[in-house]
Amino acid sequence: MAREGKRLKSAYADIDRDKFYSLADAVKAIKTRAVAKFDETIEIALNLGVDPRHADQMVRGVVELPHGTGKTVRVAVFAKGDKAEEARKAGADIVGEQDLFDACNAGNMDFDRVIATPDLMGLVGRLGKVLGPRGLMPNPKLGTVTANVTEAVRAAKAGQVQFRVEKAGIVHAGIGKASFSEEKLAENVKAFVDAITKAKPQGAKGTYLKKVSLSSTMGPGVKLDVATLA
């Protein structure tokens, strides 16, 4: 443990907390300092010039990163008949109706994403208090309430990332792993920032992208020069 602590302390040593790094330099700095003994997640955090307490300043959406997140995503699908079979063929981990409802209601939720066909939303809607707080409630705006379960499952498995601004105006997400190349991480960052930019609400006033930073699970954070993200 002492040796691991020294490695982590060393990773923080020469990071300039006041400097705004270019995207290329930030990715390199974070990647080379991800020294934990596991494949650390590379995370992005954006401070936005919005107040999500107002409905016209909510930022929410979904983006499919070009290189995925490196995370194995378990997908549950509420579907029946042919749609249930489509979901299974597409690679869904769990497919069901009342049985899946009962499992969720009992707290057995070994999955990361929930998809539902429109005809079963009457059933799924009753799980709002269970799925909602976990960010798992299917939503047509996010493509998780759909008759096209094949595409929805494929997108989820490919590394589609859902985002939503928090109370303090912050959006954060994992955009890859330390084992990714610098080029792939940079491309994922650009794709995520582009999605956030396109999701700018009409009610937003002043500077929208106020601050962007990158970090790894156990490593230091660095601030990005927003101008290099265009």
From Swiss-Prot:
InterPro entries: Ribosom_uL1_bac-type (IPR005878), Ribosomal_uL1 (IPR002143), Ribosomal_uL1-like (IPR023674), Ribosomal_uL1/biogenesis (IPR028364), Ribosomal_uL1_3-a/b-sand (IPR016095), Ribosomal_uL1_CS (IPR023673). Pfam families: Ribosomal_L1. GO terms for molecular function: rRNA binding; structural constituent of ribosome; tRNA binding. One of its GO terms (biological process) is translation. One of its GO terms (cellular component) is cytosolic large ribosomal subunit. The keyword rRNA-binding applies. Keywords: Repressor, Ribonucleoprotein, Ribosomal protein, RNA-binding, rRNA-binding, Translation regulation, tRNA-binding. Binds directly to 23S rRNA. The L1 stalk is quite mobile in the ribosome, and is involved in E site tRNA release. Protein L1 is also a translational repressor protein, it controls the translation of the L11 operon by binding to its mRNA. PANTHER family: 54S RIBOSOMAL PROTEIN L1, MITOCHONDRIAL, LARGE RIBOSOMAL SUBUNIT PROTEIN UL1M. Part of the 50S ribosomal subunit. Belongs to the universal ribosomal protein uL1 family. This is Large ribosomal subunit protein uL1. It comes from Paramagnetospirillum magneticum (strain ATCC 700264 / AMB-1) (Magnetospirillum magneticum). The gene is rplA.
